[in-house]
């Protein structure tokens, strides 16, 4: 990455104005350096093209031109990088500066095997190009590749059992279904063990659609039935492996997964025994009616979350407030777990599953 080519790309893009102003003074050059230094630092310190893309992602909201320079460098550095040329095309299209150039980089992404068709289909950056033959051809190819990439990944499960000695051997255990937030996945690791040690099988499920990498998923609408079907399929797969108590299936979610967990409990109370909703979020409307009665529900959010998330937390408190037992907790953080989650979450799960908590 620390190549002359990468520096040349960045310099050509960011210092183009200097070529037109050859008489700039040293003071002018000093004034330009703050705009250039984040790109130079990234090019010097990034280990590979993938890290350049991550750094560009972090810059995109604050400085599109700096991000564009890094995406270009990553695209040139690694001929197998898919997202880099895609993001170059998207940023050029967003700026409306050169449709031909934007389509050229979109084609380059296609030639490298672009597969995230659903993301391309809804990407507003390309709204003015959807009529073009190039865009339509790239989209068709990406949608076809997506079906291959998604097979076996969308809805895949991850299982974490309680530690030895936590529950009686041979018991058909309750299940806590974990619904992840936007852009991550249902994979469980050792850091999640405290949740399983509350006395249930922890079942993580990948979302119903991949986004732009094989470990990045979301729960798609309209509505929540697709998520319900994915959860039921995950439970069926789990039941084929081990004995579980299907009458004691609980939901736990974060952010977008939390909204879907709350909606599933409201709409399918015969299938779910309770829910723990952490920092609900998402773009769909929260259900306004609930069939759930006699359930234990926890709603947890940070006081520093955005207004939409705060409203959604209150919406769920009201939604389950009649005929159910609702506990509420706020913490000092933002859209994240509270700092004490490793102890407070297992305690909350035990209460949700019928304990004293």
Predicted regions and their residues:
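Primarily recognizes the serine-hydrolase "nucleophile elbow" in alpha/beta-hydrolase
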Residues: 247-293
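Short beta-strand/loop motif that positions the catalytic acidic residue
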Residues: 299-301
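C-terminal catalytic histidine-bearing segment of alpha/beta-hydrolase fold enzymes
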Residues: 130, 310-317, 321-357
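Acidic catalytic loop of the alpha/beta-hydrolase fold
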Residues: 303-309
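A domain-start/cap signature at the N-terminus of enzymes
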Residues: 26-61, 65, 111-173
